[in-house]
Amino acid sequence: MSRVAKQPVPLPKGVEVHVADQRLVVKGPKGEMSVPFHPAVELRIDDGGASLTWSDNQNAQAGTMRAILNNMVQGVSQGYEQKLEIIGVGYRAQAKGKTLSLSLGFSHPVDYSVPDDITIETPTQTEIVIRGIDKQKIGQIAADIRAYRPPEPYKGKGVRYAGENVRRKEAKKK
């Protein structure tokens, strides 16, 4: 049996969970999310939270659905946030509405358009904060922005996640 799927997902106040037309729908104070729900897994709502039941050969699917449900509940109740740091001379970012403009040493600025349900802020020119309710979408946007100029191992310049350790290499010796 899946150890992940055995544990119930606690539901905070103001969060509703139900399955409609093979889709798992979660509503909360920060918004609403829905994802396709596997037909071999069943959802039960108790006073302690939401739990899953499944047939024996669907252990992996049940664990996946439980993790997705937990991420959705946390997203609509608290939200998610990902921070990026820009390191390098002349490297900077600026948020203008739903567009993020990045100067990363190219001959042109890189413009990244942000989806409607995600907000991007730049507290300083070298920090980017991505906020929203969908954990997967926030992670993908952060990875897309980082991919424009990933940190290089010799000087450490580039876009990195906050707190990311970049392994440095020694320069070539004569």
Curated annotation (Swiss-Prot):
Protein known as: Large ribosomal subunit protein uL6
PANTHER family: 60S/50S RIBOSOMAL PROTEIN L6/L9, LARGE RIBOSOMAL SUBUNIT PROTEIN UL6M
Function: This protein binds to the 23S rRNA, and is important in its secondary structure. It is located near the subunit interface in the base of the L7/L12 stalk, and near the tRNA binding site of the peptidyltransferase center.
Entry's Gene Ontology BP terms: cytoplasmic translation
GO cellular component: cytosolic large ribosomal subunit
Annotated InterPro entries: Ribosomal_uL6-like, Ribosomal_uL6-like_a/b-dom_sf, Ribosomal_uL6_a/b-dom, Ribosomal_uL6_bac-type, Ribosomal_uL6_CS
Self-association and partners: Part of the 50S ribosomal subunit.
Keywords: Ribonucleoprotein, Ribosomal protein, RNA-binding, rRNA-binding
SUPFAM superfamilies listed in its UniProt record: Ribosomal protein L6
Gene3D superfamilies (alphabetical): Ribosomal protein L6, alpha-beta domain
Pfam family, one: Ribosomal_L6
Record-linked HAMAP family: Ribosomal_uL6_B
Record carries keyword Cell wall biogenesis/degradation: no
Annotated family: Belongs to the universal ribosomal protein uL6 family.
